[in-house]
């Protein structure tokens, strides 16, 4: 199921992340589009400022501004 609770919230990587679209260095910024569970794992789809959109694991990112989270 797609969870859009945090859609539009800014995030950043907390360490180097290698993806199929390209590498994301530590402190790369992006915007969360949605979260989804796939094969028992939670994934977060992020539109990165580097020009591509790829899923990452929640432990690879942190939310930049909690004031934007819609509950």
Region locations from a protein language model:
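Basic/aromatic-rich interaction segments and small domains that mediate binding to polyanionic partners
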Residues: 2-67
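Long, low-complexity intrinsically disordered regions
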Residues: 69-71
């Amino acid at each position: 199921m797609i969870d859009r609770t945090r859609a539009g919230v800014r995030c950043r990587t907390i360490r180097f992340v290698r993806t199929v679209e390209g590498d994301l260095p530590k402190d790369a910024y992006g915007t969360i589009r949605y979260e989804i569970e796939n094969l028992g794992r939670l994934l977060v789809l992020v539109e990165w400022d580097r020009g591509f959109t790829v899923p990452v694991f929640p432990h690879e990112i942190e939310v930049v501004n909690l004031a934007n989270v819609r509950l």
